[in-house]
């Protein structure tokens, strides 16, 4: 899992397989100040495509001042 955050927001990314054995990039994101969150599932056909999707997401999040946390 890759975790990113700003002072008030968080964004988590992971690669999983669903019940049908399809590959998904799952993004959970929301505000640290409320209990509400969102989930986005992106269907991909291979690990290479999943890594491309994650790289694109990371570039966008970095432009919005998110930082990677460990």
Feature roles, as predicted:
Residues 35-38, 45-63:
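A short, charged, amphipathic alpha-helix used as a generic interaction element across diverse proteins
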């Amino acid at each position: 899992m890759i975790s990113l955050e700003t002072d008030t927001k968080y964004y988590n990314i992971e690669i999983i397989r669903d019940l049908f054995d399809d590959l998904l990039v799952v993004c959970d994101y929301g505000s640290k100040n409320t209990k509400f969150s969102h989930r986005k599932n992106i269907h991909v056909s291979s690990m290479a495509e999943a890594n491309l999707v994650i790289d694109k997401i990371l570039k966008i999040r970095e432009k919005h001042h998110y930082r990677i946390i460990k």
